[in-house]
């Protein structure tokens, strides 16, 4: 909710344009912020691709800049992005 009315960051936008799953490497200096001024960083993210277009992103955020996602977290963002893409196509 605290990020609802903010624009996404340039690195997150580039991640979306890459059209592939992103996972943090656990290196604090390489963290991606979801938007400017956020206290959290992107742990993992998957673009929402509906009708061939990127329409958004599902991102799991964390305050731990050295965290890496586990298999369940990666699967969760992938499934959520695929579900939302199907809903947008209907």
Please identify what each model-predicted range represents:
Residues 29, 37-47:
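A short beta-strand signature within small-molecule sensing/ligand-binding domains used
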Residues 4, 8-14, 18-30, 55-90:
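Juxtadomain coupling helices with adjacent low-complexity linkers
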């Amino acid at each position: 909710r605290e990020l609802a009315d903010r624009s996404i960051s340039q690195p997150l936008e580039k991640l979306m344009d890459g059209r592939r799953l992103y996972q943090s490497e656990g290196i604090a200096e390489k963290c991606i912020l979801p938007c400017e001024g956020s206290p959290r960083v992107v742990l993992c993210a998957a673009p929402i691709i509906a009708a061939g277009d990127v329409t958004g992103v599902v991102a799991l955020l964390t305050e731990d800049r050295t965290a890496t996602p586990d298999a369940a977290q990666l699967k969760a963002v992938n499934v959520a992005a695929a579900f939302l893409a199907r809903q947008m196509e209907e």
